Amino acid sequence: MNKLKVTLLASSVVLAATLLSACGSNQSSSTSTKKLKAGNFDVAYQNPDKAIKGGNLKVAYQSDSPMKAQWLSGLSNDATFATMSGPGGGQDGLFFTDSGFKFIKGGAADVALDKESKTATITLRKDLKWSDGSEVTAKDYEFTYETIANPAYGSDRWTDSLANIVGLSDYHTGKAKTISGITFPDGENGKVIKVQFKEMKPGMTQSGNGYFLETVAPYQYLKDVAPKDLASSPKTTTKPLVTGPFKPENVVAGESIKYVPNPYYWGEKPKLNSITYEVVSTAKSVAALSSSKYDIINGMVSSQYKQVKNLKGYKVLGQQAMYISLMYYNLGHYDAKNSINVQDRKTPLQDQNVRQAIGYARNVAEVDNKFSNGLSTPANSLIPPIFKQFTSSSVKGYEKQDLDKANKLLDEDGWKLNKSTGYREKDGKELSLVYAARVGDANAETIAQNYIQQWKKIGVKVSLYNGKLMEFNSWVDHMTTPPGANDWDITDGSWSLASEPSQQDLFSAAAPYNFGHFNDSEITKDLNDIDSAKSENPTYRKAAFVKYQEDMNKKAYVIPTNFMLNYTPVNKRVVGMTLDYGAMNTWSEIGVSSAKLATK
């Protein structure tokens, strides 16, 4: 699996679903004969024919923005590329997991946790090598921490969770030149790393927990590149080293990756001779499938489902998404020097009643019914239903439009309706807000304009940012560049979530991805409680998650929008295709049953 903690998404509602990868993510497991279902979808395709020797798999990721190739996970935040990097190792993930996202043995590395000593010991495989044949070493694991914690590299993945590693905060702030809590029992060139924590956390047994990293970076290959140049270096963009079953032979900036087998891969040798992975636009994807151009397309959105569900030559697979879309309010800025969100913006949105009212005014269910083809449902909280052990139907959010309640909240807050304009005013100022909606599928502008009309019904004047939708990469830069822009009030976002559902990395006081920059002591307490020693008790942890969801809905710093089912069309010549989250070798095992794509 792709072990990024959280990933910005680039289609659907606003940031779109990473869908893991059409073929599992990093390395997906032995093809299962189990008949797994997600909703009405099969999770795996059982091709009755056997794979031929060799062949080229043709894969695409749907996006209306160019991919941003970055092979170091700590410097990457593009969902399109996160998925497209899968055949090469998913930006070099290390660990295998079961279908419940718990670590298991057998991957590129194993991890052993010790509660008494408060340590994690990572042991790399002896035969783990980079695609140039050089050894993957303990230093390569530690170097990934450097790229995130050293501000000179420009990573935006520093979080409170990582600060739980002894000495990492001092390294991050420049007080120390090395990371005291990461040591090498067999030396930097060995295969063992010990990570010392301040506290053990209940989520540490889960992949994506954020408390320790799950990737490596080729230190010897990169050590001579200046930190400020690393993100743009060909060594991390077009000519990388990888550890997966395939290696990139050719990377065309923004467009495509050609993969060939990695002769130094430690695991099962791939069945395919090559994989071509391209970006395809929303406008062209359905036609591309109709003409049998691709075996698989990732990232297709719900509004396209009716057009592809009965295409000849294809089987549509599905899976519950580790996904949440939401609405953000701009409440402050990010202090990069001190790694803290500061909630100091002068805006009517500082008032909880205003935030709640705007949330209640949206007609999310109506939008879903019209555009999602049954694949999206209004979200009652920020935790998707795939994590059912941490959710409760008792949590009530903003899934049902309630204009009466919205109007009442604004009335209580002193916002008076000016009958001549149709908009509310207070202290001589109109309630006027800027909506930074962004380009998505063909319905994106229709949906944005719909919400603007709903807000008008409660007397809130909302206009699009610069009068139009924002291009995705421009939107990302606008939201992620510290200290954060002051020229927007509302935006939408969606995330491919980690397989450990704690949301420290999204909404903690230190999280750069806390786009609205709220900083609330009660929410901080809730997040810390979820990850406390008490939460090693599953019943306690569920209660902590439920309280967090209730408090977030009440305070309305962000408003949950949708949960999703992912779907992926797969050509019927493909063998070994599964979306099972517990699959760990799919890129090696996937093949094709004929040289040409199936057409019926």
Curated annotation (Swiss-Prot):
Residues 1-22 form the signal peptide. GO terms for biological process: peptide transport; protein transport. Part of the ABC transporter complex OppABCDF involved in the uptake of oligopeptides. Essential for uptake of peptides larger than three amino acids and for growth in milk. A lipid is attached at residue 23 (S-diacylglycerol cysteine). PROSITE patterns: PROKAR_LIPOPROTEIN, SBP_BACTERIAL_5. It is found in: Cell membrane. This is Oligopeptide-binding protein OppA. Disruption phenotype: Mutant grows only on di- and tripeptides and is unable to transport the pentapeptide Leu-enkephalin. A lipid is attached at residue 23 (N-palmitoyl cysteine). Keywords: Cell membrane, Lipoprotein, Membrane, Palmitate, Peptide transport, Protein transport, Signal, Transport. It comes from Lactococcus lactis subsp. lactis. Pfam families: SBP_bac_5.
